[in-house]
Amino acid sequence: MSKSGRRGRAPALEYVAGNGLLDRRALLRNGIVFAGAMTAGVAGTRTGAAAEPVAADALKDEEWSLEFGSVPPPVQTPSQFEKDVVRTLSNPKGEFRNSHARTPHHLLNGTITPNPLHFSINHCGVPNIDPAKHKLVIHGMVRQPLEFTLETLSRYPLVSRMAFVECAGNSAPMFSSEPMQVTAQAIHGLVSNAEWTGVPLSALLDEAGVDAKAKWFIAEGADAQFLDRSVPVKKAYDDALVAIYQNGEHLMPGNGYPMRLLLPGYQGNMNVKYLRRIKLVDQPAMSYFETKAYSQILPGGKTWRFHFLMEVKSFITQPSFGQALNGPGFYAISGVAYSGTGRIAKVMVTADGGNVQPLRAEFVAARGQTTQPVTTPLAFPNQHYNSITSWGVESNGEIKHVYA
């Protein structure tokens, strides 16, 4: 209370250079008043707005409250009112692509991607693999070649790792000379995050007995194109998994059923699906997928053939193109940030190129290569923002992928 006996008013909010982003000091001072504004709300709903007063008997009994509900199905699916929350089989221009299924990030919240909505890319369709017949063979420069089935792998001690998987070509529209007016799904939909459970590859290699001269292993999938990639042996002993579960379920067919290689932080194509072969070698295979399909052309025409790590990155998920904002007020700007190194220091955001603000986030180093949520409130007065831009900063100060 003030000396005059009147309840003091909270200080006026400070804006950052008129661009709508709230000053962090103002947020700290007004933390109670504006707690609602810090909630990661769905775009289209004003956060921190006062509710309309109603009478105590305003609720009426709708039809669903007056009859028995349906019998729960053997496999639960989302409500019929969520029918638009689906993957899209198209490129960013909306052209049909039967090999691309993009995650609807702008319609989701949190960091775990539901299995049915996890992105997938398949070079030769989704194979219908009988797990009773599928085998994984480890051979090459080993003391004892070994063979594994899904059943035998299930007998080993299993470990779980939270990790994102991202296509090397994700966010390609950001390199367009003209900004594309499309959703976060269309631009950034080729990345998803899950809890993967399986057997550490190092345990299987130790059992096989790897020759000290083996510096690489070649991972090959059982799809009709036999995708293969060369991986340094060191990665196998760091954190590689032969994954057989995805968010507690056996892998989805589009994500590698019955088993896949998981290389946290590495390009998606290196996380070989339908894993059937691991061959220990002293030289990389120099296959089509690593010399052409997934190599980078550098200035001057040279090719960077073995670029593994997915660098620090963030993008805005809400609001996204096509989502309506219900009048002026405060809205949560939400997104995700991730890095192949697992060392994100902060994420920054600006509206229409105004002053820069950090997004609110708690980065837990132990979480490693997994997507992490970020959010900040943004004031939308009676004006229009052309762009909201975010970027992640690694602990060493490195910045990559500045996206609006």
Residue positions per predicted region:
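Structured, non-membrane catalytic/scaffold regions adjacent to prosthetic-group chemistry
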Residues: E52-A404
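Short, intrinsically disordered low-complexity segments
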Residues: G5-G8, D23-R24, L28, T45, ...
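Generic cytosolic/nucleocytoplasmic N-terminal low-complexity/intrinsically disordered segments
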Residues: S2, G18, R29, T45, ...
